[in-house]
Amino acid sequence: MFLFLPIPLNVQDIWKVNSKYKHVLLTCPVCQNKTVRVYRLVKSLALIVLPVLPVYTSKVLRCSHCGWYEPVDSAMIDQRRRREDLPTPERPEASAQQHAFFPGSSSQQTDIPNVRPQPHIPPPRKSDEAPPPYSYK
């Protein structure tokens, strides 16, 4: 008598941080966070949940925040690292510090910090005032 038992096989993805690039953080083109790392993606044939045979291996850039990933090679990784390490030109209005003006102070004093405006807080009610009556119609 022949007994047919199905063998559950599937393809499993295994993500490993590439040890050569473990300190590299790049900017994600989708979410603009600096959370992209270089991973080694191994697709393997698995029996139930145990990986048995590796089928495919590649290097990928993967964002841990939004899940975006892109297959790359070593030359592309080095190119992106150089591009992100370039200094960005500063805007003149962003580099100039603006100080708050206080009446009666000298204009030559430059170590005055900016003061944030305080939110409007209404004065407290007197305890003898009753709250407004509610109307039921």
Swiss-Prot record:
Species this protein is from: Schizosaccharomyces pombe (strain 972 / ATCC 24843)
Annotated stretches, region: Disordered: 79-137
Name the UniProt record assigns to this protein: UPF0768 protein C1952.04c
Comp. bias (Pro residues): 119-137
Protein family per UniProt: Belongs to the UPF0768 family.
Record field: compositional bias (Basic and acidic residues): 79-93
